[in-house]
Amino acid sequence: MHERYVPADVEAAAQGDWRAADAYKTKEDSQKPKFYCVSMLPYPSGKLHMGHVRNYTINDVMYRYLRMNGYNTLMPMGWDAFGMPAENAAMANGVPPAKWTYDNIDYMKGQMQSMGLAIDWSREIATCKPDYYKWNQWLFLKMLEKGIAYKKTGTVNWDPVDQTVLANEQVIDGRGWRSGALVEKREIPMYYLRITQYADELLNDLDGLGWPERVKIMQQNWIGKSFGVNFGFPYELDGEQKLLRVFTTRADTIMGVTFCAIAAEHPLATRLAQDKPELLAFIEECKRGGVAEADVATMEKKGVATGFSVKHPLTGEPVEVWIGNYVLMSYGEGAVMGVPGHDERDFAFAKKYDLPIKQVIASEGQTYSLDAWQEWYGDKETAVCVNSGKYDGLRYAEAVDAVAADLKAGGFGDKQVTWRLRDWGVSRQRYWGTPIPIIHCPSCGDVPVPEQDLPVVLPEDLVPDGTGNPLAKSEAFLNCTCPTCGAAAKRETDTMDTFVDSSWYFSRYTAPDAETMVDARTDYWMPMDQYIGGIEHAILHLLYSRFWTKVMRDLGLVKFGEPAKNLLTQGMVLNETYYREDAAGKKTWYNPLDVTVTHDDKGRPVGATLNADGQPVVLGGIEKMSKSKNNGVDPQLLIDQYGADTARLFTMFAAPPEQQLEWSGAGVEGASRFLRRVWSFGYGNREALAARAGFDAATLGDADKALRREIYSVLKQADFDYQRLQYNTVVSAAMKMLNAIDGAKGATPAVLRETYGVLLRVLYPVVPHVTFELWKALGYADEFGPLLDAPWPKVDEAALEQAEIELVLQVNGKVRGALKVAKDASRDAIEAAAVADEAFAKFSDGKPAKKIVVVPGRLVNIVV
């Protein structure tokens, strides 16, 4: 054992032992309770960031703690390896996405291994490998057989110059990110999955999940079960009587309709735009906008009047029809009723285009004004109908019932339950993804690839150039034979949404070598006992994975219907930001390591200068670590300088796992200092600690009893904190333990060995390398076995018992001292001891006690 703590040497030694023992390879074991903990698999972007370090350390701590407590634990890892960033990097560097991806995986895997993570690497998967995505294709074909997968046209962003489909984030101000061309919306055939068939189950099953409430609420809102009325505004066009259908949850406001808005793609818009250049121009402008709901929510709301009117179904009055850029054909009926008096978006639209605004609900004590929107205008809870004829005086529910009944009687519509959730479009016009296993035959049409011909292998040697899909230009991939008639045919060149890859990987971890999609091992491990990932995945990934799991269950592949029992959404890692702004308003961001900060006498930052030139930079405040703000900390530099254990200790100590973590260089230094203290104590007392002398707890001296009482008291709290995932307070407990052990005067070697052994086990899940090596060097491994599987220390309840207790002594309600009495002292004995104490004599001014109040176990108050 070396005198000085050298993290690189300690960590290399520990990891060498773990590799030699294949310490983290895990098998099913029916004799133990299982615990399957999974971190969301990373995209192989090139390097780990501190968010990764935090996530994987949380998982690792959980694994090690539960393994010591007798669980059969599993922590796997893989790579979410398909996706657009690889294509972009390939274009920038002139290399195939496969090479870029595999190189990144190799580097990031090395980084993970340097962290000492308890990963069973025999289960590693990469979603870009054929032995994985074969099962994406296989399940897709099963869903096609069951009618869960189907084909229909969908709207995409089309770059007319690059001749390619763009993702929403590649459309910047309506133009393609590479070409700068005005982007068009196009309708193309795509494959969809009927996630809407599972909407009720996806909604109801949230109740049984141990997930954060805000994640459940986000999913509930995304699924969006709505009770309302679907009805039509009648109109006549081209000699035909028709209905412009809308859905509303606010039928109580129907008498306030002053316009209707339709999507640019609505058939009525197309018909009305004939021979109207201004309408055609606006429709084309709308088609250049984003197709995502998020884009519509944030864009400027624009519209144009068609000059056409429909009739109000209850009053017969004309209602003007507008084309609105905020109405999506893919949501609802592609048309909405405009009630500017009681909908904030409609209010703003009406103000902008000078449309009528009618008040048709009122709220007691409130005054309606057309000047500005007020929140109560849209509040159905307090709403009472006014200016609504026969519906006046009705509250929300009563009004909806009455309006729905009248619409039904008139043949215009009825009540309906609708869902915000839409079927999942899985076709992507991209190269680097799972090929969709369909063959296009001129005679037979779309033909599924036979199961025995799976996987359809994606060629890995193509280099995208940004113009079209490389698969469409690859003769070797494209040309094939129809499996039905034998004629020359073409393969589907669309690939699957990468959310498909991440929807079931956790099940494949359980049986990575299976010749089927999953096997019996999957039902042993799944569902995950703990899933760990960022809140940004609360909706799409988590919702799609829940859907995918239910489909697998319904196909008889697994016995469970939810992927994860419990979910932890770890907080973001934050750091200071610094920048300069040029005359044009462009900001240049500087890394905190390149900046010197000055502080006032209270330690608050008051200024900063760039090290390179000594000139000032602006303090931008604390924000999430990101490339764009250049405020990230490279984990590898941290590990190289301080060691993995210091990085792990800081990320666990700085904040509870679910809260944001503010980066602190001083905090890292403090973590390093603490580990040096742990090592130094072990080295400095190595002879005493290595001696395996027993002891009789009943005959121990006061110093030994006091130390054991402190250690086991803290252990009790640390164990509780481990169970509730509050790892920051676990570290605090370990610090208390070290202070107690280091400060113990007169403790015997046997008790020092016992208590230091408790400390090493409490610290081990957080800092496994240094504790593992100390455990081995000081002979604990010879007694208890390697620290990996050493039993978790049990609290010695007898050590917590005290012969004496200390009570606060008050005189006339003011604290004047402390009183030691026997633990089982009677009230009379406590009162006698209190009046005999020198503090009473000193502060009673010679007056006798009038009254003595005893609060058992806490205090004595003498009133004079």
Curated annotation (Swiss-Prot):
Transmembrane segments: none
GO CC annotation: cytosol
Keyword presence, Transmembrane helix: no
Motif 'KMSKS' region: chain residues: 624-628
Catalyses which reaction(s): tRNA(Leu) + L-leucine + ATP = L-leucyl-tRNA(Leu) + AMP + diphosphate
EC code: 6.1.1.4
InterPro entries: aa-tRNA-synth_I_CS, aa-tRNA-synth_Ia, Leu-tRNA-ligase, Leu_tRNA-synth_edit, M/V/L/I-tRNA-synth_anticd-bd, Methionyl/Leucyl_tRNA_Synth, Rossmann-like_a/b/a_fold, tRNAsynth_Ia_anticodon-bd
UniProt family annotation: Belongs to the class-I aminoacyl-tRNA synthetase family.
Protein name: Leucine--tRNA ligase
Source organism of this protein record: Burkholderia cenocepacia (strain ATCC BAA-245 / DSM 16553 / LMG 16656 / NCTC 13227 / J2315 / CF5610)
Lineage: Bacteria, Pseudomonadati, Pseudomonadota, Betaproteobacteria, Burkholderiales
